[in-house]
């Protein structure tokens, strides 16, 4: 029999499970304070939904054997967009929804074999707000959540922001024969391949300039204006950064604008962002999101355009951070109940029920102890806080 879990997955010990629960619980409390309501999308969906109109590769979906083409969700955004446009279509907008659950991704390893990765995700979706107010609320909520999780400047958090319309502007004027190739070079920050392009020298020089532009939002926007001229989008982004930069500085988060940033899943058609934290080994993306109007409209039967935006946290990656404080602010005292050979096991059970009725945690040592000293040794060995000795 195999003694290891499937490649790409791991067994979680009780401390890891508890930490996942506490992170998820804290996030859900934050979402609800902001007026978001919980929904629970299914783990199993039709492949047509899971691929999110081509935004998610078919290869990344774990497929199930059934009469209908179905699979396990690699992300929850498409499922919520579907529910918002169908079962929740009658509800007043804006819809503020949050969810938490397991996602499954199929991934090709270095040997060309497909493995399944399982993860825990928690996030929010804001449906029905078409202007930049939606992104501002979501970014404020993202930063507030990060602060409440006590992710501090020690993790060097960076909020990386891009916009699909900036990339479209950069690619405008380029023939369709080259567009996909150039987009790949830009999103991969490939200066060498870009320099070797056989295209108009003026366009190439603009592309090379853009590849070197990222960092402080105000500086990046100034440089983009110098290259492409004034643009309503640039004005809207200036307003957004003017609002969110004070709160980001307060929480120790650095904001970077990257004109060529593209997320892995191609779900988004507007603002896109991800929150990155530094670990001992490498940077980790702990949250990502953006606007996905096209996705939510693909599910609607209404003649009116629908809009949507949201983000999600990776609970597993947050758990792996070396946080400033542990999530034990509501730690319950652990009590061990031990009894001598002159007492009955039932006596210990009665005492356990009495402690439980007070809302506290208590466990019974199933075998009698010879002495109280032996019971005290078990308390220390097993990490209990106190002993109830019945003799």
Curated annotation (Swiss-Prot):
Keyword field: Amino-acid biosynthesis, Cytoplasm, Histidine biosynthesis
Pathway stated in the Swiss-Prot or TrEMBL entry: Amino-acid biosynthesis; L-histidine biosynthesis; L-histidine from 5-phospho-alpha-D-ribose 1-diphosphate: step 1/9
This protein's record includes keyword Ubl conjugation: no
CC annotations in GO: cytoplasm
Family annotation (InterPro entries): aa-tRNA-synth_II/BPL/LPL, HisRS-like_core, HisRS/HisZ, HisZ
GO molecular function: histidine-tRNA ligase activity
Compartments, record wording: Cytoplasm
Major localization class: cytoplasm
Domain of life: Bacteria
GO BP annotations listed: histidyl-tRNA aminoacylation; L-histidine biosynthetic process
Family assignment from sequence similarity: Belongs to the class-II aminoacyl-tRNA synthetase family. HisZ subfamily.
Subunit field text: Heteromultimer composed of HisG and HisZ subunits.
Additional comment: This function is generally fulfilled by the C-terminal part of HisG, which is missing in some bacteria such as this one.
PANTHER family in the cross-refs: HISTIDINE--TRNA LIGASE, MITOCHONDRIAL-RELATED (PTHR43707:SF1), HISTIDYL-TRNA SYNTHETASE (PTHR43707)
HAMAP family recorded: HisZ
Function: Required for the first step of histidine biosynthesis. May allow the feedback regulation of ATP phosphoribosyltransferase activity by histidine.
Name of the featured protein: ATP phosphoribosyltransferase regulatory subunit
Origin organism lineage: Bacteria, Bacillati, Cyanobacteriota, Cyanophyceae, Synechococcales
